[in-house]
Amino acid sequence: MTLDNLKHSAILSTLFKMADDNDLLGASEFIKDRLYFATLRSKPKSTANTHYFSTDEEFVYENFYADFGPLNLAMLYRYCCKLNKKLKSFTLTRKRIVHYTSFDQRKRANAAVLIGAYAVIYLKKTPEEAYRALISGSNASYLPFRDASFGNCTYNLTVLDCLQGIRKALQHGFLNFETFDVNEYEHYERVENGDLNWITPGKLLAFSGPHPKSKVENGYPLHAPEAYFPYFRKHNVTTIVRLNKKIYDAKRFTDAGFDHYDLFFVDGSTPSDIITRRFLHICESTSGAVAVHCKAGLGRTGTLIGCYLMKHYRFTSAEAIAWIRICRPGSIIGPQQHYLEEKQASLWAHGDSLRSKQRQYQDRSVPQLISSMDNLSISTSIFKSHSLDRMEENDYAENDLGMTQGDKLRALKGRRQPRSATTGAIRVEDVKVHTRSPSQPLSRMKPPASSQGSISPLKSSKVPASSSSSSSSSSVSASAKRIGRSSSSSTNLKSTRLASSLGNLYEPNTESISSGKPPSPSSFTPHPVRTTYNYHYEVNNNNNQYSTTSSPSKSLGYNLNHSGPSGASANARLSAGEQGHQRNPPAGLSGLSTRHLSRSIPSLQSEYVQY
């Protein structure tokens, strides 16, 4: 090659680099001269110095109504695998890698959570550092996420909230992509395969309510309690908590050796203090995992699980909502969001008190402390029940005359098509396997007809905060297509799926999921006043034959009167002296033999927070 040719090549290389630099003006830099995030109006072409890629059409949220994110845990995992592979690719070694997104505000917010979460998980950035990078330069703020309700949005969940929730899950061992089984997650979150997701692995499982008989009804697959038995036993689920009206006989669970509790409150409403305390006590008194369900396993289920996260792991309300929605999209709806926000301070106080007592007893060599529920009260001036009277479930709200919120959400989820091939299983060569300052004035109420995302939540946060379930989607407008599809046309297909999926529920080679660790500090801002329901109902369905001495209701000796429309009452007195045989928990399970760990995923050292 002549000297002139060398000079010409060098000049061209310089010009290309200058052009690339112009394209990256205003882009967010995550790794200096290596990894960037940019919002572009048109699709760019990769050059000799820069590699562009986008995930806007690959990872798509499956909406219920107007909700659009955040993307679920499987999509986050696949994104991290994809980006790790690019960063380690020999052909891209000397290139700058740019994850670009469009000006579609919904896609842009989801893309920001993906790369921000990558920075938190792998680059060890704090959520605030990652968010600062996302809004640096000429980047505008991001559209806040909303709930899966049909009405107006009254609560904004920000990109920063999502990053803080992921960070908190990392700290307590809920999120570990070295052991995460993406195929199992995507299988069981499908309606035809059980519609279940772990929120805290090994402890709290959210799932859709079982039915008396396994069948396909109006195109929606329904599962009987027995369909869940093998999976529950494999994963050491010992207790089931039902929050909706009685559809199946609880004796079907108790006869199989499970504990079963009824803590009923109205679909779409918030729980009373009594319901919340009893739920927390059940979870705290159970050595195994607790499976929680309502109608769809989204609203009421997510709300009580959120209370547990706030009390035992000091999640903020926003962190809890974000993490639960990443695990199980569509969770926590409408007033339930504000309920969690208002309960945060009192739940933190009770959690701190419990941990303090546990430390004192541990110093005296006492192995475990079970808090006394009689002396606890979740104080609030807003969410108090007006009466302690109990009503039968059939007296109100959930009746057979119309569809409830849970019915509609279940129907929408049941009409979804199987996962798109764009997010199919990764090839073997690819896969080896808020803190909000107490003085912050930010309100989560969204003003009508105003532009979302105009305020950066980071700028109001002055205290650094510490921050793994639904399937991949095939289209942003999938909801409209699902709603318009006739149920009769899909019945045969759903029947076939249901028949095969029930076999999967009985599949013995299901991987167990490891449990998390203790909590970490944060802060909170209360929410404006609102009203609530006072219809609540609780029953311990466990008879003497299947009870254990550690059953919460037995230790408390509750005496409940449930009044029906005729004024008759049923007294459910549970004695602390009742005894039953002890059930040995199933042995721990080894990982699936077909699972591969990913070379593209660096070692994760979860930072457990010890109080």
From Swiss-Prot:
It is found in: Nucleus; Cytoplasm, Cytoskeleton, Microtubule organizing center, Centrosome; Cytoplasm, Cytoskeleton, Spindle pole; Cytoplasm, Cytoskeleton, Spindle. The active site is at residue 294. Keywords: Cell cycle, Cell division, Cell projection, Cytoplasm, Cytoskeleton, Hydrolase, Nucleus, Phosphoprotein, Protein phosphatase. Disruption phenotype: Morpholino knockdown of the protein causes a shortening of the hair cell kinocilia in a larvae at 3 dpf. There are no other gross morphological defects in the inner ear. PROSITE patterns: TYR_PHOSPHATASE_1, TYR_PHOSPHATASE_2, TYR_PHOSPHATASE_DUAL. Residues 193-359 are annotated as: B. CDD domains: CDC14_C, CDC14_N. Residues 179-192 are annotated as: Linker. This is Dual specificity protein phosphatase CDC14AB.
